[in-house]
């Protein structure tokens, strides 16, 4: 249990071996520690194949990148995390997959796997511009609304803006996604672009390119919007996953990465017992908006 707990915190087999020697005074090989952590692989498989609910009001899909050694070559792999908000307003990690081939075909297989595990309907999927995701959603869940992640949208815009302008620029961007309706949001978008485009020529291009996938949010009340664009749930999970990157720069294999991700997930989600704030109101609005698709 102690070994698995240390592995979940992102420690390498060598660090665990050294810690055990320091604390308990006996030597353990890295191979032994690897064998102990391998014992959770069947548990991981069961978790990854467990049945899911039929309906999820909201799903978030996000990617975190890691370096993995593969036959002596270091490759960059993405861990794709799917986080659901269930009908009780509680957060739940549905799936973690490791891959390097983002495409509509890949995403279709991921979404079909959710269907095979019992998911019949999803109201809204929030994701960043993952390659092929929009087409895959349309094929697997034709009634599902695709919403670009506002936090990523803002972050991508501010990436190349120096500190001296970042606060003012971020404040102006807020006028877009806090607008009361789509028309006012579009006017705000044009205003912000006009103000900053001379200084940062391409900063707002993605807003225009992605506008169709940004606009679904404007039909909702502030309560629902907050759930959609406040990505606290996925951000807190990501900070747990990023710790793994800080602990070790390269994972020795795909399996080692998967073990670390699952154990970190089990650790992080133990505390997830509460429903989202104002969930009753949010659920009521979604029930009206998506009539007949949510359980009464």
Predicted regions and their residues:
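Short, amphipathic alpha-helical "recognition" segments used to contact nucleic acids or chromatin
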Residues: 1-10
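Amphipathic alpha-helical transducer elements in NTP-driven molecular machines
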Residues: 13, 34, 58, 76-79, ...
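DNA-recognition alpha helix
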Residues: 14-25, 263
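RNase H-like nuclease fold core
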Residues: 26-30, 35, 39-127, 131, ...
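Acidic/histidine-rich catalytic cores and adjacent linkers
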Residues: 142, 175-296
């Amino acid at each position: 249990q102690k070994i698995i707990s240390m592995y979940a915190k992102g420690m390498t087999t060598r660090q665990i071996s050294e810690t055990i020697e320091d604390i308990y005074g006996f030597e353990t090989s890295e191979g032994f520690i690897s064998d102990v952590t391998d014992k959770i692989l069947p548990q991981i498989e069961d978790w990854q194949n467990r049945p899911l609910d039929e309906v999820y009001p909201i799903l978030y899909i996000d990617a975190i990148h890691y370096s993995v050694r593969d036959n002596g070559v270091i490759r960059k792999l993405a861990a794709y995390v799917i986080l659901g908000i269930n009908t009780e307003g509680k957060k739940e990690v549905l799936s973690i997959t490791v891959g390097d081939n983002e495409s509509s075909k890949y995403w279709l297989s991921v979404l079909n796997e959710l269907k095979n595990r019992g998911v019949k309907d999803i109201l809204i999927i929030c994701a960043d511009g993952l390659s092929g995701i929009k087409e895959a959603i349309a094929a697997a869940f034709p009634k599902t609304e695709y919403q670009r992640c506002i936090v990523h949208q803002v972050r991508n815009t501010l990436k190349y803006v120096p500190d001296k302008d970042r606060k003012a620029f971020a404040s102006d961007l807020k006028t877009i996604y806090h607008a009361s309706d789509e028309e006012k949001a579009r006017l705000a978008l044009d205003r912000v672009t006009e103000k900053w485009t001379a200084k940062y020529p391409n900063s707002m291009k993605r807003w225009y390119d992605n506008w169709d996938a940004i606009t679904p949010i404007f039909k909702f009340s502030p309560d629902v919007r907050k759930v959609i664009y406040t990505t606290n749930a996925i951000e807190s999970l990501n900070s747990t996953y990023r710790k793994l990157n800080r602990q070790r720069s390269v994972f020795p294999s795909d399996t080692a990465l998967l073990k670390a991700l699952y154990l970190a997930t089990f650790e992080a989600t133990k505390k997830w017992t509460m429903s989202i704030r104002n969930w009753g109101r949010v659920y009521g609005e979604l029930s009206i908006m998506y009539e007949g698709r949510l359980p009464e």
